[in-house]
């Protein structure tokens, strides 16, 4: 049997980078090649290859800039294999902003390299569909009907997917359950606080989360209201642009950033709250999109980002309501990469969980290591994502936890896929969902 592979074409040749944003010397010159990033890097830990480590990728970025390495298939493969989890930034003693480097390299790839057909089309589908609310809602409704009919469950239980490929089965297992009514129906609403107004906040609802995590968004709004927040859900908000930033599609990311800055900034809000670590991380870094492009929006982006808060960060910083009912369960917590590494928020979720009576909390070994979700990484780099998920679930098994907690929707999907393959029943929840349950238990026992 002859295997036919479609080869991608390098369009810049061996002469360095093409037009557009490039990785800057200011950032990669900080690397002292000490190698402390290696053991922090999930792909290096799995493969043991220097070129799939942060240090190795920085070396390749420099070689392309100097014209010693073409912007071709090999370079793209190693840059694409990066999760952009930024664990290397936590480990780095020199303060290398690796995320900026790899995203700039991907901007060059996006502009100057033609990917193979299937990979290009899959990426294009995500990048074009997710920011389009109308198309996303239509697709969500179709998926909801498909899931509600029982057809999806039959397909998953049958062996039909395995006839195509194991990877297809893995990707289908990641598909989120649509939750009606969609949270998009609440866009534009104002939710009054329980008791006196302490803060006036705007809630960032996300894009996929509006369809697949409506209950999580509802729980977030309830918890904020319980803690004295008047919660406004701006109707004009849109996708945060994280997928586009991480893929180097920076022009589109700037458009999406401007949409959110306009929707939130002039509303007189104290804070902009999100329950998605990936969204919060990129929104806090909106100024980076405009620092060389648009001075007016750079200043507005700085003001916007200064008010962005993860919901766990916000609650831990205020005198949050500790009147929780008891949740008698053993729980563990997985640090989302873009909360723990990109935003350096680790203690806040644990502080909130420690306040719930009856909860037995067990630390997860290597909780800082990526679960393999990483935006759409688990779709476009499924083999590596599956390896990381397998390792993560082994660590979860060691805890004996019946509750797996995290603080990012993408991680929820990945971890739920891991749980679905196990014979042991576990729940996977966002931290704020457990807080909401604990408040509800307290109300029932009054």
Residue ranges and their predicted role:
Residues 36-39, 59, 77, 144, ...:
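Generic structural signal for well-ordered, non-membrane alpha-helices
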Residues 29, 48-52, 70, 244-251:
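Alpha-helix capping and helix-loop boundary segments enriched in small/acidic/polar residues
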Residues 16-28, 68-79, 192, 225-228, ...:
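Short, intrinsically disordered, charge-biased short linear motifs at domain edges
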Residues 36-39, 49-54, 230-233:
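N-terminal glycine-rich anion-binding loops that anchor highly charged ligand groups
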Residues 98-446:
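Iron-sulfur cluster-binding electron-transfer modules in prokaryotic oxidoreductases
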Residues 2-20, 44-77, 95-125, 424-434:
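Non-heme iron-sulfur electron-transfer modules
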Residues 24-44, 72, 76-96, 338, ...:
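Cysteine-centered iron-sulfur cluster-binding motifs in ferredoxin-type domains/subunits
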């Amino acid at each position: 049997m002859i295997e036919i592979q479609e080869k991608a074409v390098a369009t810049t040749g061996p002469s360095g980078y093409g037009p557009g944003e490039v990785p800057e010397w200011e950032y990669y010159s900080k690397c002292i090649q000490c190698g402390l990033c290696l053991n922090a890097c999930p792909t290096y830990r799995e493969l043991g290859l220097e070129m799939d480590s942060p240090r190795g990728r920085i070396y390749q970025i420099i070689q392309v800039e100097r014209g010693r390495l073409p912007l071709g298939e090999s370079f793209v493969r190693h840059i694409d294999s990066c999760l952009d989890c930024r664990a290397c930034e936590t480990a780095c003693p020199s303060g290398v902003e690796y995320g900026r480097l790899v995203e700039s390299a991907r901007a060059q790839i996006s502009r100057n390299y033609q990917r193979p057909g299937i990979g290009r089309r899959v990426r294009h589908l995500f990048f074009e569909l997710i920011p389009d609310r109308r198309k996303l809602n239509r697709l969500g409704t179709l998926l909801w009907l498909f899931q509600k009919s029982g057809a999806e469950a039959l397909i998953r239980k049958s062996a039909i997917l395995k006839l195509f490929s194991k990877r297809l089965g893995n990707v289908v297992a990641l598909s989120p359950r649509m939750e009606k009514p969609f949270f998009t129906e609440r866009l534009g609403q104002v939710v009054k606080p329980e008791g006196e107004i302490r803060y006036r906040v705007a809630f960032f609802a996300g894009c996929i989360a509006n369809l697949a995590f409506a209950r999580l968004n509802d729980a977030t709004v309830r918890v904020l209201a319980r803690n004295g927040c008047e919660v406004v859900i701006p109707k004009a908000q849109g996708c945060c642009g994280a997928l586009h930033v991480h893929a180097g599609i920076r022009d589109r990311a700037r458009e999406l950033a401007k949409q959110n800055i306009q929707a939130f900034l002039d509303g007189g809000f104290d804070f902009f709250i999100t329950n998605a670590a990936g969204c919060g991380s990129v929104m806090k870094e909106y100024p980076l999109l405009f620092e060389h492009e648009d001075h007016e929006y750079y200043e507005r982006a700085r003001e916007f980002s200064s008010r962005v808060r993860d919901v766990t960060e916000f609650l831990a910083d205020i005198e949050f309501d500790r009147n929780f009912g008891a949740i008698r369960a053993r729980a563990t917590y997985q640090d989302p990469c873009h909360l723990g590494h990109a935003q350096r928020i680790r203690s806040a979720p644990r502080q909130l969980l420690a306040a719930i009576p009856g909860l037995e909390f067990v630390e997860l070994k290597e909780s800082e290591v990526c679960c393999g979700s990483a935006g759409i990484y688990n779709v476009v780099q499924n083999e590596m994502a599956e390896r990381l998920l397998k390792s993560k679930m082994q660590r979860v098994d060691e805890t004996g936890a019946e509750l797996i907690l995290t603080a990012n929707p993408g991680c929820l999907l990945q971890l739920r896929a891991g749980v679905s393959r196990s014979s042991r029943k576990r729940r996977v929840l966002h931290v704020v969902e457990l807080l909401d349950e604990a408040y509800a238990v307290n109300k029932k026992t009054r």
